[in-house]
Regions:
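Bacterial N-terminal signal peptides
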Residues: 8-16
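Bacterial N-terminal signal peptides that target proteins for export
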Residues: 1-7
């Protein structure tokens, strides 16, 4: 193949990889979509003791901070969490309502592969999913060929958000 024919092909490939990476929604916009124009004040779940150990078991490693912010209350909460796909973090917004996933959305994706997890055909599988007694998801999630690590990251974050939702104090009266 002549070099002048290869260049357009390389440019198209490079552009498609660049389009896969990016910020799809800002966290503030995700919270506004979830709660309306004025999201509730954030609360904090501290990762200490059993909470820290369970979070570590769910993720397979320690969460990078000692506390995780949430918005909402013990009935309905929103979480913005990150997990590494293959090499880069994936930022995900999750809404938990009465112990079930209400909504999951990829807010930012930084990997060159696996970006398909951001599409509704994949994320809709998480709707109304909960935790089993062993803190696994109570329903199977179909994978995406070539996106195994991204799929795994979203499944871990769904499990983590569902678990952390149970750690919100029942007396928290944040709207």
């Amino acid at each position: 193949m002549k070099p002048n024919r290869i260049l357009p092909l390389v440019l198209v490939l490079a552009c498609s990889i660049a389009v896969a990476r990016g910020t799809y929604q800002e966290p503030e916009d995700f919270l506004a979509d979830t709660f309306g124009t004025e999201p509730p004040s954030p609360g904090v779940v501290w990762l200490r003791g059993e909470t820290r150990e369970t979070s570590k078991a769910i993720l397979g490693h320690k969460y990078p901070s000692l506390r995780i912010r949430y918005w909402g209350n013990a009935e309905r909460s929103a979480w913005i969490l990150e997990e590494i796909g293959k090499e880069q973090p994936i930022t995900v917004g999750l809404v938990v309502s009465n112990g079930r996933i209400e909504r999951i959305k990829v807010l930012a994706f930084r990997e060159s592969r696996g970006w398909e997890v951001r599409h509704p055909f994949f994320t809709d599988q998480f709707r109304d999913i909960g935790l089993t007694g062993e803190r696994g998801l109570d329903r199977d999630i179909d994978g995406i060929s070539g996106a195994t690590l991204s799929v795994r990251a979203l499944k871990k974050l769904a499990r983590l958000a569902l678990y952390l939702h149970t750690r919100i104090p029942a007396t928290d009266d944040t709207p």
